[in-house]
Regions:
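C-terminal catalytic "cap/lid" subdomain
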Residues: 1-235
């Protein structure tokens, strides 16, 4: 395996599946667990950050008359709901997990302690990070970048519904062209919006590569971790 310790970033919306008839689609969850299990069987150390957009996004707060900070905390709680669902599903598939949160929730998860998180990874446990970094005004992309740097992951894998980074939105423009590789500088200059600027800068300053790939295509996660081209590498 090219990457021995990874940080996998998943979006909350992806858990809804294509029908979006429920907050969490069982078939999607099952597929994700099967993909992750293939890495565990290969000895890859896995940390996961999952969004909460299928339940609540902090950005919705203003339209609902909710204070921005309060809305961000609501979004953090949404990520914990998704993290708990993923944890249960992974354990049902025979994997060992630990859920760590950026805010205190002693009854359901551990607080984030960097050295403890690294030790969990070394012992082969999947570590799921919930509740963002515990502060408002930060996205789950920023959480992914920060936690990846903190636990010394060798790559951030951003699982999306498209197979990489394109010159423009491939869902709107059929003539969009996919990049196989980009430097951080190129991605910045082209304003490709791979992550928010805080998250992107953290990766760039720490020379932490990002791979954007289609998480919904079977076998893609294993290919990416193996170093095969199955998305866009930003480094």
């Amino acid at each position: 395996m090219k990457y021995k310790r990874i940080l996998l970033k998943l979006s909350g919306e992806a858990l809804q599946g294509s029908s979006k008839s429920t907050n969490i689609d069982k078939a999607v969850m099952e597929q994700y667990c099967e993909e992750i299990k293939t890495l565990v069987d290969e000895g890859v150390q896995i940390a996961i950050v999952i969004g909460g957009g299928n339940i609540f996004r902090g950005g919705q707060a203003e339209s609902l008359g909710i204070d921005r900070v309060q809305g961000d905390y609501m979004g953090m709680l949404a990520t914990v709901i998704n993290a708990m669902a993923l944890q249960s599903s992974l354990e049902r598939h025979g994997m060992y997990t630990r859920l760590m949160a950026g805010i205190k929730m002693e009854q359901v998860c551990e607080p984030f302690i960097r050295r403890r998180a690294i030790r969990h990874l070394e012992k082969g446990r999947i570590v799921i990070f919930g509740a963002g970094i515990g502060n408002p005004y930060f996205t789950t992309d920023s959480t992914a970048s920060l936690r990846a740097v903190e636990v010394q992951a060798s790559v951030v894998l951003k699982g999306t519904r498209v197979d990489g980074v394109y010159t423009k939105d491939p869902e709107k423009f059929p003539d969009a062209v996919r990049y196989s590789k980009l430097s951080f500088q190129e991605a910045y200059e082209k304003n490709l919006n791979i992550m928010d600027m805080t998250a992107f800068t953290l990766c760039m300053e720490n020379n932490l590569p990002i791979i954007v790939f289609d998480m919904n295509k079977k076998g893609n996660l294993l290919k990416v971790v193996n170093g095969e081209e199955a998305g866009t590498l930003i480094s």
